[in-house]
From Swiss-Prot:
SMART domains: DEXDc, HELICc, SPRY. A motif (DEAD box) lies at residues 370-373. Acts as an ATP-dependent RNA helicase, able to unwind both RNA-RNA and RNA-DNA duplexes. Possesses 5' single-stranded RNA overhang nuclease activity. The keyword Hydrolase applies. Residues 69-246 form the B30.2/SPRY domain. ATP binds at residues 46-53. The lineage of its organism: Eukaryota, Metazoa, Ecdysozoa, Arthropoda, Hexapoda. This is ATP-dependent RNA helicase Ddx1. It comes from Drosophila melanogaster (Fruit fly). Residues 483-676 form the Helicase C-terminal domain. It comes from the Eukaryota. It is an enzyme of class 3 (hydrolase).
Length: 727
């Protein structure tokens, strides 16, 4: 038995983890896997590379596989409520409120929401000129209202013109008009709901006693279909549409609703695409899990992990699909229609496929947001809310929708707000805590001062800059802000090369602020030395196939340097990385920790160097007012006057980082000599630091006398107990 199997993970999944050399679960996996397998919503935060992907992929794969197996064996959905193939005359799993649950047989509704009303309609309605009846029994205390409504009516029964309800407080309601009617009812009472379409009357009974006509239907609703409906607030009701004997038979020509023939009944259009179908299986394009990633690289990374994990899962086969831009839509559509159970995708392509009806959300059981803070910062809050609203909160086999959120910063206001709004009593798994720099990372700052270092004035092959100062009067001898800003850009290219040479960097990730900066540095390094400075770029303006190939080349160590932006590199797990260079500090202090955390993993030593300008640097900042959003933009005015530039103040950003980490970051000069404060004075970046122990052996020796004394006391106490037992 593998360590993962002790959490209840399938042996087939355990074999896959074993083959990946995952001997023991990481902390986040040990916490999250049992919680997800147990059916709960989970919020988890841990560093990139800590196994977050496995923490949600393994349990989701297991539950999806078990559901498919039960479908094949016919174990699930007895009572006709699996996979959207609902038997006529049950309460709908789809046409209902967010916090209302429907049992697998479709005949009992429950809502435990104290503050809001949540409603539900039946899967089938009646029409024509007949007289129809159903019973609703109050099975738990709470507030409830039951009756009839059209398909266009508000789920909050009785609050619009097309809903007619009778509530437990003894009030009838239509169009928000609440009038005294009959008498109050409560737990164990049986309410009969009568609809006379011939005379266009709605009436109710309580425990067999007719309470009289409650409503007369307006003529404009004469041709409408009416569905049994209920709305609950912390209450529960059981329904009988006539499949079994009524407790109080209606008489007077009324028949059970389920006895309405085809000419007098109509299926609820919101019951789902497979409603009434003979097959219990969901549609091939109705996945059970949706995993949203902020970038195509992360989506590919997660998809590849799922493919590895499910290698030994068979009979039935779990099919996963990657939905990202840059791939032909027809190709993805063809794969989707072959049957898909887990979808991993980026927001843009997911939205396109869902809005066009190619991906159905009717059977979605898991909604996963990976790197949620990045998704929210990219402006996908509205999309996430909309998708969550579309996904049924109770699946067709009676299981509750599970939401899993992974974020580097769980305590960010936006993430907290989203969790409160969308998640159901989530468990917080925060193994990250406050931002801190790992002991295995040396991080230093190299100040770039164009007033002290004037070598920028005589560079033979300077780096190409972003063009911010193309129309400014910048030249040596002119000490204007613009000239010093341009000098910073030139010096940073030189300092980057010098850092590479000084530390013989053969593998590093280099962060630039913008896509244009990445392109400029890539050209500069290639001009300086071919193979010696071999590099590739990773950012949103590169074609998807190129981005994929560039990342693979860097992972396979075919090139030495990966130049990228924060967004493109978010969440990428690149192992054994010894060096990282910040050409420009990030404007978000938490991103500094994310960047330098890419080195020094798996107990291997890493060096992070940040180039920080001592003077303000003028940089591009394309806001919503920029029509091209940066493409061929030449508006170098400041944003205060609707321009596309700002003055970037790195000393202030450095102060924010130091305050955030509560440390003073060590500074080095342009020679890039990094002081080593290790025990033996030697560090090889990228190799394990053998002296990072915690003194555990000494600690054991200190505890030996105490443990020995404890053993003696335990022996004495048990001996005393046995002696007294004999007496």
């Amino acid at each position: 038995m593998t360590a993962f199997e002790e959490f209840g993970v399938l042996p087939e999944l355990g074999m896959a983890t074993d083959e990946l050399d995952w001997t023991l679960p990481t902390d986040v996996q040990a916490e999250a896997i049992p919680l997800i397998l147990g059916g709960g919503d989970v919020l988890m935060a841990a560093e990139t590379g800590s196994g977050k992907t496995g923490a949600f992929c393994l349990p989701i794969l297991q539950i999806v596989w078990e559901t498919l197996r039960d479908l094949e064996e016919g174990k699930a959905g007895k009572g006709g409520a699996i996979g959207g193939a609902v038997t006529p005359w049950t309460m709908s799993f789809f046409d209902r409120g967010n916090a209302l649950a429907v049992t697998p047989d479709g005949l009992r509704c429950q809502s435990r929401e104290f503050k809001e009303w949540h409603g539900c309609r039946a899967t089938t309605g009646v029409r024509g000129k007949g007289k129809f009846y159903f019973e609703a029994t109050v099975t738990d205390e709470g507030l409830c209202r039951v009756g009839w409504s059209t398909q266009q009516a508000n789920l909050d029964l009785g609050t619009c013109r097309m809903g007619f309800g009778f509530g437990g407080t003894g009030k009838k309601s239509n169009n928000r008009q609440f009038d005294d009617y009959g008498e109050a009812f409560g737990k164990a009472d049986v309410i009969g709901c009568l609809l006379d379409l011939k005379n266009q009357e709605v009436s109710f009974t309580k425990n067999g006693q007719n309470l009289g006509v409650a409503f007369r239907l307006p003529d404009n609703l004469a041709k409408e279909t009416f569905y049994p409906a209920v709305v609950l607030k912390n209450a529960e009701m059981q329904f009988n549409f006539g499949k079994t004997d009524f407790k109080y038979a209606p008489g007077n020509g009324f028949v059970g609703a389920c006895q309405a023939g085809p000419e007098h009944s109509k299926a609820n259009p919101i019951t789902g695409p497979a409603a009434g179908a003979p097959s219990a299986k969901p549609a091939p394009n109705a996945p059970q899990a949706i995993i949203m990633e902020p970038s195509r690289e992360l989506a590919e990374q997660t998809y590849n992990q799922i493919e590895k994990f499910k290698y030994h899962l068979s009979n039935p086969e779990v099919r996963s699909l990657l939905l990202i831009g840059g791939v032909r839509l027809e190709e993805q559509k063809a794969q989707l229609m072959q049957g898909t159970h887990i979808v991993v995708g980026t927001p843009g392509r997911l939205e396109e496929m869902i809005n066009s009806g190619l991906v159905l959300l009717t059977h979605c059981r898991f909604f996963v947001l990976d790197e949620a803070d990045a998704l929210l910062k990219q402006g996908y809050t509205e999309l996430i809310d909309r998708l969550h609203k579309q996904i049924p909160k109770i699946t067709s086999d009676g299981r509750r929708l599970q939401m899993v959120v992974c974020s580097a910063t769980l305590h960010a206001f936006e993430v907290k707000k989203m969790a409160e709004r969308l998640m159901h009593f989530p468990t917080w798994v925060d193994l990250k805590g406050e931002d801190a720099v790992p002991e295995t990372v040396h991080h230093v700052v190299c100040l770039v001062d164009p007033q002290m270092d004037t070598t920028w004035q005589s560079l033979r092959q300077p780096i190409g800059t972003d063009g911010v100062h193309d129309r400014d009067n910048v030249h040596p001898g002119n000490h204007s802000k613009e000239t010093l800003s341009q000098a910073v850009k030139l010096l940073k290219g030189e300092y980057c090369v010098h850092a590479i040479d000084k530390h013989n960097m053969d593998r590093a990730i280099i962060f630039c602020r913008t896509k244009q900066d990445c392109d400029n540095l890539e050209r500069f390094l290639r001009q300086r030395g071919g193979k010696h400075y071999s590099c590739v770029c990773l950012h949103g303006d590169r074609k998807p196939q190129e981005r994929k190939e560039n990342l693979e080349m860097f992972k396979r160590q075919q090139v030495k340097f990966l130049i990228c932006t924060d967004v493109a590199a978010r969440g990428l797990d690149i192992t054994g990385l010894p060096f990282m260079i910040n050409v420009t500090l990030p404007d978000d202090k938490t991103n500094y920790v994310h960047r330098i955390g890419r080195v020094g993993r798996a107990e291997r030593m890493g060096l992070a160097i940040s180039l920080v300008a001592t003077v303000p640097e003028k940089v591009w900042y394309h806001g919503e007012w920029c029509k091209s959003r940066g493409r061929s933009c030449n508006n170098t005015n400041l944003t205060e006057v609707r321009g596309c530039c700002i003055w970037y103040n790195e000393p202030n950003l450095l102060a924010e980082v130091e305050d955030h980490l509560n440390i003073t970051i060590q500074q080095v000069d342009k020679t890039m000599d990094v002081p080593v404060n290790d025990f033996d004075g030697k560090v090889v970046y990228g190799q394990k630091n053998l002296r990072t122990g915690s003194g555990y052996e000494d600690h054991v020796e200190q505890l030996v006398p105490t443990v020995r004394k404890l053993t003696e006391l335990e022996l004495q106490s048990q001996s005393l107990f046995l002696k007294r037992l004999k007496v």
